């Protein structure tokens, strides 16, 4: 285990899922405040496990997503938006993991192997970094077995879910395997002011 004083948290972010959250906030002229969201995760774990809030620290954050090559992103007018999005992650010491996106013959964007990379990297780092907790921001059923494996290693697998769809897209198979869920939608219903703590207004920002 990690130090008795510090409880180490590994944070692993499904990039497509996270971008959908950010896109959903656009209608409110807001975006995720990465620093404050990380602080909220630390606070939530401390409350759930009755720990000193100052002892729960996200020691590593990793982000996984497919990305267009620079030329393709520029052609699709995505280059600046994507780089500004990445800047926010980098400013908060989030490690970026990318594979190139390719278009299928029918024009559908396709990314291969990101989910496998996410799972392998999460499991490997959970063991080698000796995390006390692993938090996943995702909703994909593909990570059901990852959550189960983490629990077999006596590492709580925590899910943060947040969606702007009419129905919760979080896979039931995944929810059945996690140790506990930080359900932002439910928390916002109970305390609407939370939105001001974990997001920020876009209009007043330069970047």
Regions found by a protein language model. Name each.
Residues 1-110, 156, 163-165:
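Domain-level signal for Mg2+-assisted phosphodiester chemistry and nucleotide/NA-binding surfaces
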Residues 85-207:
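Nuclease catalytic cores that cleave nucleic-acid phosphodiester bonds
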């Amino acid at each position: 285990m990690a130090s008795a004083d510090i409880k180490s948290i590994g944070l692993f972010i499904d990039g497509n899922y996270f971008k959908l959250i950010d896109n959903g906030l656009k209608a409110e002229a807001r975006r995720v405040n990465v620093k404050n969201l990380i602080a909220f995760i630390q606070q939530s774990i401390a409350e759930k496990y009755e720990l000193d809030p100052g002892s729960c620290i996200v020691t590593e954050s990793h982000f996984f997503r497919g990305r267009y090559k620079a030329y393709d992103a520029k052609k699709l007018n995505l280059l600046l938006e994507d780089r500004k999005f990445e800047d926010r992650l980098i400013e908060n010491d989030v490690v970026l993991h990318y594979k190139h996106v390719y278009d299928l013959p029918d024009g559908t964007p396709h990314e291969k192997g990101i989910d496998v990379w996410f799972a392998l990297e999460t499991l490997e780092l959970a063991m080698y970094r000796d995390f006390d907790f692993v938090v996943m921001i995702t909703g994909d059923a593909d990570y059901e077995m990852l959550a189960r494996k983490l629990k077999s290693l006596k590492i709580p697998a925590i899910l943060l879910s947040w969606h702007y769809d009419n129905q919760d897209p979080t896979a039931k198979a995944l929810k059945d395997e996690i140790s506990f869920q930080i359900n932002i939608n439910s928390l916002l219903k109970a305390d609407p002011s939370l939105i001001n703590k974990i997001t920020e207004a876009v209009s007043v920002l330069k970047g």
